[in-house]
Amino acid sequence: MPRYLEGWIKDVVENAKRRPYVSRSREKPVLQIIPRIRAVKGAGLNPVIAEYKRKSPSGFSEDRDPISYAKSMEQGGAVAISVITENTVFGGSYEYLERIARNVKIPLLMKDFVVSENQVDTAYDLGADFVLLIVRILTERELSGLLEYVRSYGMEALVEVHDREDLDIALRSGASLIGVNSRDLFSLTIQKEMAMKLLEQIPSTVTKVAESGIESAEEIRLLREKGADAFLIGSSLMRNPDKIKEFVQG
């Protein structure tokens, strides 16, 4: 059994299992996120994955048009866009992903509580290029199986961890792209020091993404010093999209 599957997380996962597969005819090739992160980093810029979300359990709430937001992030230099598709707690939808995929030319992350191959099928069909897999809501066997299934489409998985045990599982499963979430999904608290220590423990062969609570270019610089290769930023950019250039160039 996964170590953390209770309370609101359990409800969200159960809902994810019930959501039907959405079939579409994919209209674009899969874009590879890891080489793009390396290219942006190599150019002396910060690879920012800009997130589109409507709300979250932490109390965040913001209503922006998905297309105009995504285009502004692309124009501002974001390496990719994360689209939350979880529909009960985060106010996301598959429609947002599909619409954004038709309007931008940078990689898209389907950010959801992915627990089934049907969700991966949906991600591919709607135009995602990489998919979030959260270690804490999956068994190690499930994680390995879903990682292999995601890659069978030519996509990549952003494997999210929060502590050393999560990281060990992610590494054993063969993750190439690991996201360190400073927010504990269960308590919703931000633990930045713990996240920074975890970033330092990830092998250099793995591409590392710092997630949650990033509010300034100074924080990005500090996370970069700790080994982060890319930065997933949601609330700060949703509140003030103009920050994207500062974050990319800072």
UniProtKB/Swiss-Prot annotation:
Gene3D superfamilies recorded: Aldolase class I
InterPro entries, alphabetized: Aldolase_TIM, Indole-3-glycerol_P_synth, Indole-3-glycerol_P_synth_dom, RibuloseP-bd_barrel
Keyword presence, tRNA-binding: no
Biological-process GO terms, alphabetical: L-tryptophan biosynthetic process
Keywords: Amino-acid biosynthesis, Aromatic amino acid biosynthesis, Decarboxylase, Lyase, Tryptophan biosynthesis
Reaction it catalyzes: 1-(2-carboxyphenylamino)-1-deoxy-D-ribulose 5-phosphate + H(+) = (1S,2R)-1-C-(indol-3-yl)glycerol 3-phosphate + CO2 + H2O
Coiled coil feature spans: none
Any one GO molecular function term: phosphoribosylanthranilate isomerase activity
Enzyme Commission number, as recorded: 4.1.1.48
Pathway: Amino-acid biosynthesis; L-tryptophan biosynthesis; L-tryptophan from chorismate: step 4/5
Family: Belongs to the TrpC family.
Protein name from the UniProt record: Indole-3-glycerol phosphate synthase
Gene assigned in the entry: trpC
